[in-house]
Amino acid sequence: MDWINEKPWNGLSVDINPNISPHEMVYKAKLDLETSWNPTGGVRPGRPKSYANQEMFQFFKSFTEHGGVPLETIGTLDNGRIVWALATLKEEFTLMKADNVKAYLLLYSRNKNRDNIEIYFTTFRQAGGNTLQIPSKARTFFKNICRRPFTKQFPFISLEFHKFDESIIRKTKETITHGREAIIDFAKNAECLINKKVNNQIANRYMFDVFQPEISKNLSSIGNKEVNELADKKTKIGIEAITKAPGQNLETSCMTAWSLLNAVTYTVDHCLGSDQDSRLRLAWFGPGAKIKQRALELAQNL
């Protein structure tokens, strides 16, 4: 196992200046060609994809500008089907003067017409490069009001641009506020997690509870014998990551609930999936995201 220490989106994204235009974002994300997300080739009927992506990036840009959070990175997954962006929040925190955790707003679109925008808030632990979605009271779904309607006459698209009105600006600011509050609360929870000491028995059961809950409930104790005979690949990697993953040598992670949580998020972000693209897709938008949430709940209940 190679225990790499890098951002899970390395190679799948590009850092940007938040002041560039939506058109430039389309170009930088390599979404300016129809075939970039249509592997069978050809041109899809209706409005050109570049318009859809430009208007999606226009929403990203307007949302982050009105919310006061600068865009930092844009990227794509699944051959361009999913387009995402990260905007930096100022609510980053550091545990015991060494374990730095950054905070981001993640915006993304999985809808091929780019009519819908989804968001959530995530942390990024720099030691290890693992992410965790932070539950909040914020809205998670927005209609892309920047999309222009298709017309039957040349130029086949409305020339009227839709801008954020007072209502959507208010909702944007409320969403960002809820996200900031959730990150602040998580920072307090993280402080509690680093003060919860665990032993090997607790650590083994935790990993089984996260990855194989159907087995752990039938075991009175989980030692090396049970790990060797019953643990699947994910569970074994998670147990190994407790001590071997990057960042696990920090004082915050010396057999603490925090170290267990980060072992899981590292495993999901860096060790599962057939390739980096599928790994990040599953970690952010698929079963991996649910595994992380279960890991967070279990860590808080230790």
Model-derived segments and their meaning:
Residues 1-78:
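N-terminal low-complexity, intrinsically disordered segments
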Residues 59-64, 83, 96-98:
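Short linear motifs at secondary-structure transitions and domain/linker junctions
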Residues 72-92:
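Beta-rich nucleic-acid/ligand-interaction surfaces
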Residues 1-25, 29-33, 92-302:
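Intrinsically disordered, low-complexity regions enriched in serine/threonine
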Residues 54, 81-83, 101:
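Residues at beta-strand starts and edge strands
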